[in-house]
Every structure is written in C-alpha cells, then in structure tokens.
Amino acid sequence: MTITLGQSTKNDKDLFDTMDDWLRRDRFLFVGWSGLLLFPCAYFALGGWFTGTTFVTSWYTHGLASSYLEGCNFLTAAVSTPANSLAHSLLLLWGPEAQGDFTRWCKLGGLWTFVALHGAFGLIGFMLRQFELARSVQLRPYNAIAFSAPIAVFVSVFFIYPLGQSGWFFAPSFGVAAIFRFILFFQGFHNWTLNPFHMMGVAGVLGAALLCAIHGATVENTLFEDGDGANTFRAFNPTQSEETYSMVTANRFWSQIFGVAFSNKRWLHFFMLFVPVTGLWMSALGVVGLALNLRAYDFVSQEIRASEDPEFETFYTKNILLNEGIRAWMAAQDQPHENLIFPEEVLPRGNAL
C-alpha cells in the first residue's frame, strides 16, 4: 500500500468560503460582506440625489422649482418629498402609482423614497463595515456603536417622524434650503427648541466640539519631543508620528485651571465618545416623540398672564407668538393641497412687511 504525504490537490472550499476569501481579501479598499450592502446603496442614494437635484422638478408635489435645470443653485436645489396625497406609499417604480413610467415616477416624488431608503441602508452598511473591520483586526466595536447615533437621527427624522404624520410629505426634502425649511417647520409646529430632548442634543453636540478642541489643544501643548525652532509654535511639529505627549503634565495643567482633571486616557476618551453619542440618541428619541405629537415644555401660567396683562411679556411668550406666525405663514404655503386661506388681519406683519 502506498501512502502519499503532502497537500491534497482537492479543493474542499464551497461557494461561501470562496466568496469570503475574495470579499475579505487585504486590498487598498476593503470590501467585506458589509460592502455588499454599503456600496450599491451608497451609489444609488448619491446617484438618485444628483439626478433629482439636476433634472427633477417639485412642481407636482410642492409647487416649487427644485433643480439646476429650473434655475436653482447648490443651496436651493433638492430632492423633495412626495405629495401628501400619496401618504406613506413606497412609490416603487413598478408600483400602481408610476406603473413603470420613469418620468411619472420622478414627478410623483419617487426619487425621495428611493434616496431615503438606499441612504438609510447605506448608512447601516457603513456601520456594519466598521463592525466587520473591527472584528478582523481584533478591535472593540466602539466606532460602530458611535456611528449608530447619526443613523438613529437619520431614521427618526426621515422615517419615524413622517410615519407618525399623514405622509412622507412632512419629512425633510434632501437639500440645504429644504432642511432649513424643515427646521423652521419643527419650531413653528412643535416648539422644538424648548423640547428637553433637543436641549440634550445641543448639549451633546456643542459639548463634544468643546471637548474635541480642548483635547486637541492639550495634546499639542504637552508634546515634549521638540525641534530646534526659536519659539513654541515652530518648535513643535503637529504631524509628529510618535505619541510623545505628557498625560501627567496635562493633568497638572487642568487640575490648576478647573480644580479637577481626567486622570487616565481611557476615561477621557470614553467621555469624549459618550457626550456626542448620547446627545444624538436623545435627539432621535425626541423626534420619535414629535412623530406622536408630544408637546415640548408649556408654561401656561405665563401665557395666561400675558393674555390678561399687556405689560407682562417674557421671552417664552414672545417665542410662542413667533411660532404662531410661523404656522400662519407656513401652513398656506407649505400645504397647498389644503387650500388654506387666512384673512389678512390674522397674518403677522413685521416692520419690513
């Protein structure tokens, strides 16, 4: 009997193993299994947005011009939401609304649902990409966990809020000025700035910016491997590859400034992660509340007193009047399908009008 030693020539790999080898191969741009979701969805979302902002009008859904072809610029062009009459239809190209007609589909606002859905799955694919790469190189998954915060905000604003309202019409359109209009709408109809979840979101984002600036400045300040420059700014190279800053010096500095300071890098960086991520999560929860038409803080006693005493006014009562003005002006313009007509005497007029 002859026994052959050595590697078997038989290929025992199945299709899954072959795909896994190719997808996770070490290359310039990692693909991975998450890439099967990320790259097509990101391509279609961006492609749909560029197509819509270049060619597609919003005349049939909002009564607006919204494309470069109609004279808009980068700040005013948008892929706008479908009409309110279409409610929560997915507006599939082959669905009963468009019936396979691409031009009709664009006129109805089909590009908005196309961009929103592919954008959401693209963002989820990017988060899964971070999970997959972290597992491959044996890192913790905190990058992916942090990225869940902007995903939560996107999903709550573009999907959950309009699902709680009468249709996709009340979601933000994809454009700069369109997002600004949506913010004004949120303020006028929901008093969003006085919502505690919005306050937590603002504290998280601005607090994170402050922490980031302080952290970057402190690291630059405490580099101890210097050059031969004549002054502090020339002597330290901000692109120095080695980590040569002094945590002890930084701790002593901030202890003298504030009386307290971070004692180790882990707690410091966890705090820098915690502040913005928690703020964005809280904002997303607040938007879910708005989908259910939950109210912000109401100081009714001040409103009653202001209505009875013409000499009593607070910043709160002034803002409530401002919100009423936003509603009166926006409702007729923003919801033309309702045919709202307000008498001239109820519309707020400023000095410029």
Swiss-Prot record:
Pfam (any one): Photo_RC
Residues annotated for a plastoquinone binding in this entry: H215, F262
GO MF annotations, alphabetized: chlorophyll binding; electron transporter, transferring electrons within the cyclic electron transport pathway of photosynthesis activity; iron ion binding; oxygen evolving activity
Note describing how the cofactor binds: The D1/D2 heterodimer binds P680, chlorophylls that are the primary electron donor of PSII, and subsequent electron acceptors. It shares a non-heme iron and each subunit binds pheophytin, quinone, additional chlorophylls, carotenoids and lipids. There is also a Cl(-1) ion associated with D1 and D2, which is required for oxygen evolution. The PSII complex binds additional chlorophylls, carotenoids and specific lipids.
Phosphothreonine modified-residue sites: T2
Membrane topology of this protein: Multi-pass membrane protein
Superkingdom, natural source: Eukaryota
Binding residue positions for Fe cation: H215, H269
N-acetylthreonine: residues bearing it: T2
Positions bound to pheophytin a: Q130, N143
Record-level GO cellular component terms: chloroplast thylakoid membrane; photosystem II
Main enzyme class: oxidoreductase
Signal peptide coordinates: none
A Gene Ontology BP annotation from the UniProt entry: photosynthetic electron transport in photosystem II
UniProt-annotated location(s): Plastid membrane
Annotated positions binding chlorophyll a ChlzD2: H118
Entry EC number(s): 1.10.3.9
Transmembrane segments: 41-61, 125-141, 153-166, 208-228, 279-295
SUPFAM superfamilies the UniProt entry points to: Bacterial photosystem II reaction centre, L and M subunits
Amino acids binding chlorophyll a PD2: H198
Subunit and interaction comment: PSII is composed of 1 copy each of membrane proteins PsbA, PsbB, PsbC, PsbD, PsbE, PsbF, PsbH, PsbI, PsbJ, PsbK, PsbL, PsbM, PsbT, PsbX, PsbY, PsbZ, Psb30/Ycf12, at least 3 peripheral proteins of the oxygen-evolving complex and a large number of cofactors. It forms dimeric complexes.
Function: Photosystem II (PSII) is a light-driven water:plastoquinone oxidoreductase that uses light energy to abstract electrons from H(2)O, generating O(2) and a proton gradient subsequently used for ATP formation. It consists of a core antenna complex that captures photons, and an electron transfer chain that converts photonic excitation into a charge separation. The D1/D2 (PsbA/PsbD) reaction center heterodimer binds P680, the primary electron donor of PSII as well as several subsequent electron acceptors. D2 is needed for assembly of a stable PSII complex.
General remark: 2 of the reaction center chlorophylls (ChlD1 and ChlD2) are entirely coordinated by water.
Protein name: Photosystem II D2 protein
Lineage: Eukaryota, Viridiplantae, Streptophyta, Embryophyta, Tracheophyta
